[in-house]
């Protein structure tokens, strides 16, 4: 972001938060295109012609056309009508503008993160290294809890709600009108992943997540404030982590002593409420507690009433269930988490007698949801619905090394993201599907069988490339420091949480 700030020269325009002039700058689209390509999880470009056709010359021609009079006048009321600006090369120009504008709108959020980081004096490397620390938190705390309540937050009823959220940071009316145009045009595909076919919805989900996350953070800040005003519980300070696309707040247990004077006698009242753990990722949040089922039911009614009356978001109470952690698993961040009883037997012997003591230790299992993963791989044509690997159709001009590179990158991304799973059997099955699909794809290209092709190429080379645990620069961060290696030695969590939306949402498009 510092490099982008240097190129954008925001010192003059930042006083008024004018972002619209940046649409006419060439380097904006260069930054947006490079980031979109390097951030691609599976390097599977949905429109290969876009990357081939996009160049600096095309961007200059696009900016020239935008400067022409009456060619770039867009109204939110006529977004479905034909615009003379998009009459020529509609798909290419709309994709470039969508990426560039999504990059521009993120600037106020990024500047806000930088300023907050400087105020709190947060070290950047440590701030990024704890991206996946939510799972060690689950392992340390959820094993002592009893009930879990997972709720799916509804989408805003109208696109204007998200636009109003951005008005706190952007006072530029032209930028807000352009944002309103894009959101109105692609609103259905943004809130419904199955309909995501447009360039703005598939390549710029990051912008929608930023807007939605800032919108939900207003609910959460109000909720924490009201909770503190009406309860004896205290809450730890929290920050809205817009860049990491998840919010974490924890209300800690507190014991207050009240003195009631009656007949000159002091009675001590101890008020002790169970601890509440609150985690949210995008639209889904989880509320867990050590209290009783009645206590969780009160929280459920309180949350539903709070969201409906203060923010006009309608929940379906019958679809919200309170489950016991001992016999229920919940899906979060692409994992399937549950509590498992780990039995252990301790033999105690005295002078004459010996005793066997059975202890059951609760342990959090984080598993790879293999059924949704196979469904996603089948949708991407890596295997069939039964999990049998198949050859993936590729372009004839791709070289063997390029095909292996793509499959290897996909395999390493899965390996890095699910490196902390407690059972690796499902992960090994996914690797096997990708490895054999790569071999069948190469054999299909050379019009040969898999066995013949592997004998010719050498299976060691393919295994070494696909199963290597190299760090992917655009996905992972440096591993834990030597002082932390002894804490979580069995499981390693490291990845850029911005880059794993496709892995978290198994129904997304590979």
Swiss-Prot record:
Coiled coil: none annotated. GO terms for biological process: mRNA processing; RNA splicing; tRNA processing. One of its GO terms (molecular function) is RNA binding. InterPro entries: Domain_X, Maturase_MatK, Maturase_MatK_N. GO terms for cellular component: chloroplast. It is found in: Plastid. It holds the Pfam family Intron_maturas2. Keywords: mRNA processing, Plastid, RNA-binding, tRNA processing. Usually encoded in the trnK tRNA gene intron. Probably assists in splicing its own and other chloroplast group II introns. Belongs to the intron maturase 2 family. MatK subfamily. This is Maturase K. The lineage of its organism: Eukaryota, Viridiplantae, Streptophyta, Embryophyta, Tracheophyta.
């Amino acid at each position: 972001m510092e490099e982008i700030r240097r190129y954008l020269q925001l010192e003059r325009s930042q006083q008024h938060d004018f972002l619209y002039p940046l649409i006419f700058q060439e380097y904006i689209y260069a930054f947006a295109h490079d980031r979109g390509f390097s951030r691609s999880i599976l390097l599977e470009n949905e429109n290969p012609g876009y990357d081939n056709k996009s160049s600096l010359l095309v961007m200059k021609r696009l900016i020239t056309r935008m400067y022409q009079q009456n060619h770039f006048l867009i109204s939110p009321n006529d977004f479905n009508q034909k615009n003379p600006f998009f009459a020529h090369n509609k798909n290419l120009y709309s994709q470039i503008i969508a990426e560039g504008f999504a990059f521009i709108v993120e600037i106020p959020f990024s500047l806000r993160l930088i300023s907050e980081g400087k105020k709190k004096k947060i070290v950047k490397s440590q701030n990024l290294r704890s991206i996946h620390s939510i799972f060690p938190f689950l392992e340390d705390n959820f094993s002592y809890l009893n009930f879990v309540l997972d709720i799916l937050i509804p989408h805003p009823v109208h696109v204007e709600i998200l636009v109003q959220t951005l008005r706190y940071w952007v006072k530029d009316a032209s930028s807000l009108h352009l944002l309103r145009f894009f959101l109105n045009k692609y609103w259905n595909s943004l809130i419904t992943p199955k309909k995501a076919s447009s360039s703005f919805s598939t390549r710029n989900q990051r912008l929608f997540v930023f807007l939605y996350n800032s919108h939900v953070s207003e609910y959460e800040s109000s909720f924490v404030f009201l909770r503190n005003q009406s309860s004896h519980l205290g809450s730890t300070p929290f920050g809205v982590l817009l860049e990491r696309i998840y919010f974490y707040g924890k209300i800690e247990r507190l014991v207050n002593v009240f003195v009631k004077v009656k007949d000159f006698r002091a009675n001590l009242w101890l008020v002790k409420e169970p601890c509440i753990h609150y985690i949210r990722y995008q639209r889904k949040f989880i509320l867990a507690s050590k209290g009783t089922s009645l206590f969780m039911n009160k929280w459920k009614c309180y949350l539903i009433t709070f969201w409906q009356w203060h923010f006009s978001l309608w929940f379906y109470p019958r679809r919200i269930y309170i489950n016991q952690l001992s016999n229920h698993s919940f899906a979060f961040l692409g994992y399937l988490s549950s509590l498992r009883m780990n039995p252990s037997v301790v033999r105690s012997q005295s002078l004459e007698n010996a005793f066997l003591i059975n202890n059951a230790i609760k342990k959090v299992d984080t598993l790879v949801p293999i059924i949704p993963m196979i469904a996603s791989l089948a949708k991407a044509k890596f295997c069939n619905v039964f999990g049998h690997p198949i050859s993936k159709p590729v372009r004839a001009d791709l070289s063997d090394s390029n095909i292996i590179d793509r499959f290897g990158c996909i395999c390493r991304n899965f390996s890095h993201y699910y490196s902390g799973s407690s059972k690796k059997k499902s992960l090994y099955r996914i690797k096997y599907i990708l490895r054999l699909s790569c071999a069948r794809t190469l054999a299909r290209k050379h019009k040969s069988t898999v066995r013949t092709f592997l004998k010719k190429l050498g299976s060691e080379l393919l295994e070494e490339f696909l199963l290597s645990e190299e760090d992917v620069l655009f996905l992972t961060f440096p591993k834990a420091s030597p002082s932390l290696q002894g804490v979580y030695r069995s499981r390693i969590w490291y990845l850029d949480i911005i880059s794993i939306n496709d892995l978290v949402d198994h129904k997304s498009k590979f």
